[in-house]
Amino acid sequence: MILVYAEIINSRIDYVFRLIFNQVLKSDIEFTDRSTKFQQSDLPKINYSYEKFENEFYIKPHRLLHCQALIQPDIQPVWYEGEKHFFESSNDSDLPFDPFAASFYLVSRYEEYLDVEREKYKRFPAGQSILSKYGLLKKPVVNIWANVLAKKLQEKYPKLKFPAKKFDFRSTIDIDNAWAVAHKGVFRTGGALLKALFKSDVY
């Protein structure tokens, strides 16, 4: 169990903390907005507020998670341990970036709600995304940030353990088209085959 302190526990903070700890790191958290309870607790703890207390794990929050209105943050990458991170934090924070604001920005697709140029069908082009801008489209950045956070927490609280991740391989076969062929009939199937031959679209 990890105790999280925030001055205001709003829906954004609740969502992104549970995403990172419950879904990605498979760990339990508890929130409190009572500073006395937080400081007296013996649990591993995260102070996500604008005031650092003592020697707890501290991250000064970016204002993104506290704003009710949409804002257009100026996002510059923060280099840390060979990776790019977003939303720079303070010098007295245990991480140089805010993994919670950064993760919320991405998983909520926040940038798609801003006044940005769209393609002809009014869709948000991936090439305009912050991940594309910094060459991160193919990286699981939220998982990377969560792992960085977990590592730093374990340095502060050596007894804190996170469950080992389990992976499995599930092979699937898309048979939609094969099923469709079974019901097209001889003439339609033959015509499609001839068309494919003329186009050299046969494998």
Each model region followed by its residue ranges:
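Terminal accessory/targeting
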Residues: 1-203
